Amino acid sequence: MGIGNENKGFITASADALINWVRTGSLWPVTTGLACCAVEMMHAGAARYDLDRFGIVFRPSPRQSDVLIVAGTLCNKMAPALRQVYDQMPDPKWVISMGSCANGGGYYHYSYSVVRGCDRIVPVDIYVPGCPPTAEALVYGIIQLQNKIIRKDTIARK
């Protein structure tokens, strides 16, 4: 017993893998509910799906957030405000487009006042389809974002 010549176990990981693993466990989305998809976003944050267990805490300020969930119809008048919210977020930042209206204009695609997809205003990482998408679909989209973050090179040379 005591200190011997036993093999000691080591955990090895790259700095990229460690940083990305930490980032996946603390995604903080800013609450931007533009239409009916916001109800499903609130449903995903409530007790049944409980996004807190994934480390996801909704923040009221873009300066405290690293994920922007665009939930609903984006109109031309709201587009500059959405871009301003995106620009205020610290790096690294990710965008989830939630619902048919945010993805491509949805039901209101041919309206003069609707932006035909929020990807014309901000770069989108994950698209969640549906009208409105269910809370399960949003949770799946968040899991896909976590998988995307894990695969990203953070400090490695490109």
Curated annotation (Swiss-Prot):
GO terms for cellular component: plasma membrane; respiratory chain complex I. Its main location: membrane. InterPro entries: NADH_UbQ_OxRdtase-like_20kDa, NADH_UQ_OxRdtase_20Kd_su. It catalyses: a quinone + NADH + 5 H(+)(in) = a quinol + NAD(+) + 4 H(+)(out). Coiled coil: none annotated. One of its GO terms (biological process) is electron transport coupled proton transport. Keywords: 4Fe-4S, Cell inner membrane, Cell membrane, Iron, Iron-sulfur, Membrane, Metal-binding, NAD, Quinone, Translocase, Transport, Ubiquinone. GO terms for molecular function: 4 iron, 4 sulfur cluster binding; iron ion binding; NADH dehydrogenase (ubiquinone) activity; NADH:ubiquinone reductase (non-electrogenic) activity; quinone binding. Its cofactor is [4Fe-4S] cluster. Pfam families: Oxidored_q6. It is a peripheral membrane protein. Binds 1 [4Fe-4S] cluster. The keyword Cytoplasm does not apply. It is an enzyme of class 7 (translocase). The keyword Iron applies. Belongs to the complex I 20 kDa subunit family. This is NADH-quinone oxidoreductase subunit B. It comes from Francisella tularensis subsp. holarctica (strain LVS). The gene is nuoB.
